[in-house]
Amino acid sequence: MIRDSSTLQKGQNLRVEVNEVRDRLPQNILEIIKKEPVVELVGYKMVDGNQFGLVVKLTNGDINWFFEKELSEIM
């Protein structure tokens, strides 16, 4: 879980927490993430007026977004 996304930089690699997204993603995207959960941060998205989503690029080149609680930093 990312606690403060303001410290992240575009191009930074993050890990998708598969257990956090299992219920909301289509099966084809879930399979991609299960094989390779590391994604690249490409931007931010306002999602509900007071929360930001993190826009990421998957290993197959697709763009998707996740909440901070669904990602973690790779140290």
Where are these regions (language model features)?
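Basic/aromatic-rich interaction segments and small domains that mediate binding to polyanionic partners
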Residues: 1-75
